[in-house]
Amino acid sequence: MKKLKKWSLGFLSFILLFLGATFIFHRISLEKEKASLTPMGQHVLVNGHQINVYVEGDGLETIVVLSGAGIASPILDFKEVSESLSKQYKVVIVERAGYGYSDDSNYSRDVMEVLSETRQALSQANITGPFIILSHSMASLESLAWQEKYPDEVKVLIGLDWALPSSYENLKQNQALLTLAYWSS
């Protein structure tokens, strides 16, 4: 019995040491990676945090690309789209708080708060409308709210795999599940 207890304690110590070493290695690697990353776009200050705004092209009309939830780096995910459209339009990609090169935020992530931050970021970057809004997935809720609340700022809405407003209600009902998914990733 003593031998089993001693072996179990040794095994547990090994596991804890291994996990600690892995954690330290991971933190060091993250710092090294952070130093090597060169942000694309410009940072503007919105509600005390940095929002990244990427502009490509110099057309007379401006397309604002809004990515859906779960897009880690909107600039990179929509790079081919922005390159193609930038031949004729000014293409702007706003990376919301917590995405891409933007800072995280403790502010509410409801549609009106996100819309307010997007509009402030565009204003801080001296980008004026009216805009052609190209929105993907859950960003459709933001673009619909934008059209409804500020119709003079929206020229056209273009949807890519849009989520319907009822989707947002489902998110509210499943907030605990979403929080668990966030922390487990």
Stretch-by-stretch model annotation:
Residues 2-63, 87-89:
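Alpha/beta-hydrolase fold catalytic core
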Residues 111, 150-185:
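Flexible "cap/lid" subdomain of the alpha/beta-hydrolase fold that forms the substrate-access gate
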Residues 135-139, 143:
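Gly/Ala-rich beta-loop-alpha elbow adjacent to hydrolase catalytic centers
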